[in-house]
Amino acid sequence: MSDRVRFEVAPASSYAGTGYDLVTTFDCLHDMGDPVGAARHVRQSMAADGTWMIVEPAAGDRVEDNCNPVGRAFYGFSTLLCTPASLSQEVGLALGAQAGEAAIRDVVTRAGLTRFRRASETPFNAVFEARP
């Protein structure tokens, strides 16, 4: 499998390679200072029929949608970790852990991807599929 799979450490906006069938991000898009820039790079690195699998914390689009035990915990984590991390980077969009589907969809569409859907979810995470 080493001829088909590799792991690299690189900035989300400049990792190497093109023509990827699948790009995955796990619980990180909301922490990025420039998630739109990272999403644009994902789009550029994907094959024409590629897929981007985005795993993000489960969240509703409105504050009142997140007034539950998990949402409250995620707001706490977001205040302590996610938002300051994003603000400390270039652009500093600060989506936070409770960004919600609409905010993630907006990032993806602004990056030039045209198809977006919620593919799966758990009480803690939402899995989105984005395609060119």
Where are the model-predicted features located?
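Conserved Rossmann-like nucleotide-binding pocket used by diverse enzymes
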Residues: E8, T24, M53
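C-terminal alpha-helical "lid/dimerization" subdomain adjacent to the S-adenosyl-L-methionine
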Residues: V55-A111
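Core SAM-dependent methyltransferase catalytic element
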Residues: A111-P132
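A short hydrophobic/small-residue beta-strand
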Residues: W52-M53, R115
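A short SAM/SAH-binding and catalytic strip from SAM-dependent methyltransferases
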Residues: D21-V36
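Conserved SAM-binding strand-loop segment of SAM-dependent methyltransferases
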Residues: M1-A12
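A short acidic, Gly/Pro-enriched loop at the edge of an enzyme's catalytic core
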Residues: A10-V23
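A short glycine-rich, Lys/Arg-flanked "PGG" loop and its adjoining helix->strand segment in the class I
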Residues: V36-D49
